[in-house]
């Protein structure tokens, strides 16, 4: 165990005091881990659109002050009672959803939606005692999705930590703890395109490009990128995208455009925008008889869409996925190995790097739509 085990650690954290206001670097106190918890030192973290969405708090229950962040890589500092599969010094990726290994979902090979540790954006405290491990002068600071990686130290449930190869560079593989794995797994684990097949990807942000990367790894012969922003098309070529369709450039529905391009439809489609209009297009653009559409993007909670039942009766399949169907502890270490084996390229997702003291720049980049992922280096 480390020499700080069992003690309160004082460190820097980027605290969101209110919705939409710049984060403030504060000295926080991080309590020791309790039963089934692990305290980790964060070395690198990244900003995901989910952090920005809840920081803006335009459509959700606002919970402040809060420490955001959930794409990161770090090293175990100490473990709480009952933790046997991690020890101080282990390299880990904290993940917003977990794997308890005991519930029906964890025991099923088909599901990764753990009953105990499934994502909960409203909970700002730890499961074991309903309390926060962060405080400033005695005032609790709320957690975010069980990870809160915008802090030099954080406390995470053991089931939400993937133990990874210590040789893997944390400034690269930290991206695998959320968006990249979500898109990659949607293709590899759910859509499962065969070699030589045609794939359409709706939305060419980081998640969509990761889905395209999955299609590239699968040996797809054609990967059609669909996006309303034509300036994304050139960048997408690096991820295997071979053709581009901007729905605004056509009078007819984009699913009809794709059907004409592909002799009645693509074999697989992956929808990564959360737009219900795009969801309909993604489903209706797959080929009858064998086409599979996979929904990844998260819509507004009240959103609904409709399509004709004949689309199903003609043997098109519509699926949804959560975190690319990856189990946090069981599967993510092998995704890291894909990077280590040079199958998966992560460098091309990284468009910006900033020190922790300039974390608000990462928010500016994302709000302006500049780049894909910004790596935040915790040590100055």
From Swiss-Prot:
InterPro entries documented for this protein: ADH-like_C, ADH-like_N, ADH_Zn_CS, GroES-like_sf, NAD(P)-bd_dom_sf
Transmembrane segments: none
Principal location class: cytoplasm
UniProt-annotated binding residues for NAD(+): 50, 203-208, 227, 232, 273, 296-298, 323, 373
GO biological process, one term: formaldehyde catabolic process
GO cellular component term of the entry, any: cytosol
Entry's Gene Ontology molecular function annotations: alcohol dehydrogenase (NAD+) activity; S-(hydroxymethyl)glutathione dehydrogenase [NAD(P)+] activity; zinc ion binding
Residues reported to bind an alcohol: 50, 70
Localization: Cytoplasm
Residues annotated as binding Zn(2+) 1: 48, 50, 70, 178
Cofactor(s) this protein cannot do without: Zn(2+)
One Pfam entry name: ADH_N
EC class (word): oxidoreductase
Residues binding Zn(2+) 2: 100, 103, 106, 114
Cofactor binding annotation: Binds 2 Zn(2+) ions per subunit.
Family stated for the protein in its record: Belongs to the zinc-containing alcohol dehydrogenase family.
Oligomer status and interactors: Homodimer.
The protein's name in its UniProt record: Alcohol dehydrogenase
């Amino acid at each position: 165990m480390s020499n700080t085990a069992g003690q309160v650690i004082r460190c820097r954290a980027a605290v969101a005091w209110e919705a939409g206001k710049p984060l403030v670097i504060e000295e926080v106190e991080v309590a020791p881990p309790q039963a089934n918890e692990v305290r980790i030192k964060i070395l690198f973290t990244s900003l995901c659109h989910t952090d920005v969405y809840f920081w803006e708090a335009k459509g959700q229950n606002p919970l402040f002050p809060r420490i955001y962040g959930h794409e990161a890589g770090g090293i175990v500092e100490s473990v709480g009672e009952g933790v046997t599969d991690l020890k101080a010094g282990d390299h880990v990726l904290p993940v917003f959803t977990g794997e308890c290994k005991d519930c029906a979902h964890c025991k099923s090979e088909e599901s990764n939606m753990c009953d105990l540790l499934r994502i909960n954006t409203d909970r700002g405290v730890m499961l074991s005692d309903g309390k926060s491990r962060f405080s400033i002068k005695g005032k609790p600071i709320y957690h975010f999705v069980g990870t809160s990686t915008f802090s030099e130290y954080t406390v995470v449930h053991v089931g939400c930590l993937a133990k990874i190869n210590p040789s893997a560079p944390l400034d690269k593989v930290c991206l695998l703890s959320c968006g990249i794995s979500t898109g990659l797994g949607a293709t590899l684990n759910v859509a499962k395109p065969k070699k030589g097949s045609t794939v359409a990807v709706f939305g060419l942000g980081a998640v969509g490009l990761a889905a395209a990367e999955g299609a590239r790894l699968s040996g797809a012969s054609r990967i059609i990128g669909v996006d309303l922003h034509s300036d994304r098309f050139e960048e997408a070529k690096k991820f295997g995208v071979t053709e581009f369709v901007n729905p605004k450039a056509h009078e007819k529905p984009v699913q009809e455009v794709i059907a004409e391009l592909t002799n009645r439809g693509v074999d697989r489609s992956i929808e990564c925008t959360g737009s219900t209009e795009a969801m309909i297009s993604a489903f209706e653009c797959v080929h009858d008889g064998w086409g599979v559409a996979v929904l990844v993007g998260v819509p507004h909670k009240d959103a609904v869409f409709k399509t004709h039942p004949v689309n199903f009766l003609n043997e098109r399949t519509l699926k949804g996925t959560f975190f690319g169907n990856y189990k946090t502890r069981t599967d993510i270490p092998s995704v890291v190995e894909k990077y280590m084996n040079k199958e998966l390229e992560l460098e091309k997702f990284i468009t910006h790097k900033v020190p922790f003291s300039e974390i608000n720049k990462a928010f500016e980049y994302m709000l302006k739509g500049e780049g894909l992922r910004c790596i935040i280096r915790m040590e100055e």
